[in-house]
């Protein structure tokens, strides 16, 4: 079984209203540089950055992990778990499959 070793993170961006003061006279709100830097520091340094400025403004960081073996040892782990369950319950392994 092959698995893809990818982590994907998203940072939502609160986009200010046009950059100028709002009609009610209040200053525009949005994601600050401080908030963005704080969020980026939590992510893997080797992550690849992309953006989505469609309806959802956000920064997307994709981290590929080459240090993990892509061959998933799922089947071997399941066989070992079946043997352990069989020995713990005194039931022959063929009844677990």
Curated annotation (Swiss-Prot):
It comes from the Viruses. This is Gene 45 protein. It comes from Mycobacterium phage L5 (Mycobacteriophage L5).
